[in-house]
Amino acid sequence: NLMQFETMIMKXAGQ
């Protein structure tokens, strides 16, 4: 799922 991948990137970017 792309959503899962995007969530991971978003989390990393947020941190």
From Swiss-Prot:
Its main location: secreted. Contains 7 disulfide bonds. One of its GO terms (molecular function) is phospholipase A2 activity. Expressed by the venom gland. Its EC number is 3.1.1.4. Keywords: Calcium, Disulfide bond, Hydrolase, Lipid degradation, Lipid metabolism, Metal-binding, Secreted. GO terms for biological process: lipid catabolic process. GO terms for cellular component: extracellular region. It catalyses: a 1,2-diacyl-sn-glycero-3-phosphocholine + H2O = a 1-acyl-sn-glycero-3-phosphocholine + a fatty acid + H(+). Its cofactor is Ca(2+). Binds 1 Ca(2+) ion. The keyword Lipid metabolism applies. It is found in: Secreted. Belongs to the phospholipase A2 family. Group II subfamily. PLA2 catalyzes the calcium-dependent hydrolysis of the 2-acyl groups in 3-sn-phosphoglycerides. This is Phospholipase A2. The lineage of its organism: Eukaryota, Metazoa, Chordata, Craniata, Vertebrata.
